[in-house]
């Protein structure tokens, strides 16, 4: 991704798993906080908890394996948001749901992550107030119809689904 160039240009703090955080520091990223699954990193106004994500993790230069992937439970402004990242469906999402999620951002691309049907199951496990699909339609193997996913979520779970186009935002 673009994490290294963005963090160097902006000075943004990057929160990552320990191995990835160590790698980013070695690449000259100035502000890195490295944690691990189950750990909560607090900052003014909120916190980030690193949670499991079931996927592979690699960096393209020499196919470096920078540790295990993670999802994020972010708390700020009285809201709790789960960013699943690249992952499959897994039963411990039920425990993540106990965090009291306002929003869950879930992959629906299939092929490399869970697809729409499993993402609907994840919504049942997580019980968020709102779900936002991600990680789809960026290249042919992960082509999906996000509006069909929205219909599936709302019909099968009663949870509201918001489809955002690239560059769109949503105020909570």
Task: Give the positions of each predicted feature.
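Active-site metal-binding motif and surrounding structural segment of the metallo-beta-lactamase
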Residues: 1-25, 31, 98-105
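Binuclear metal-ion centers of metallo-dependent hydrolases, dominated by the metallo-beta-lactamase
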Residues: 13, 21, 25-40, 120, ...
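Structured loop/turn residues at beta-strand edges in well-structured enzyme cores
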Residues: 8, 27-30, 46, 67, ...
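Short, glycine/charged-enriched secondary-structure capping and boundary segments
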Residues: 4-6, 29-30, 63-64, 96-99, ...
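Short glycine-/acidic-enriched loop or helix-start segments at secondary-structure transitions
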Residues: 1-3, 24-26, 60, 92-94, ...
């Amino acid at each position: 991704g673009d994490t290294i160039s963005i963090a160097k240009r902006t000075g943004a703090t990057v929160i990552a798993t320990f191995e990835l955080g160590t790698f980013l520091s070695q690449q000259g990223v100035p502000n890195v906080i490295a944690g691990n699954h189950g750990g909560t990193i607090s900052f003014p106004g909120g916190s980030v908890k690193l949670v499991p994500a079931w996927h592979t993790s690699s960096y393209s230069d020499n196919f470096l394996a920078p540790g295990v992937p993670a999802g994020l439970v972010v708390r700020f402004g009285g809201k709790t948001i789960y960013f699943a990242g690249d992952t499959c469906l897994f039963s411990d999402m039920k425990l993540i749901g106990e965090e009291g999620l306002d929003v869950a951002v879930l992959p629906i691309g299939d092929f490399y992550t869970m697809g729409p049907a499993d993402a609907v199951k994840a919504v049942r496990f997580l019980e968020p107030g709102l779900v936002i699909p991600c990680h789809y339609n960026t290249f042919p193997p992960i082509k999906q119809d996000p509006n069909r996913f929205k219909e599936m979520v709302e019909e099968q779970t009663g949870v509201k689904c918001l489809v955002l186009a690239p560059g769109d935002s949503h105020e909570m």
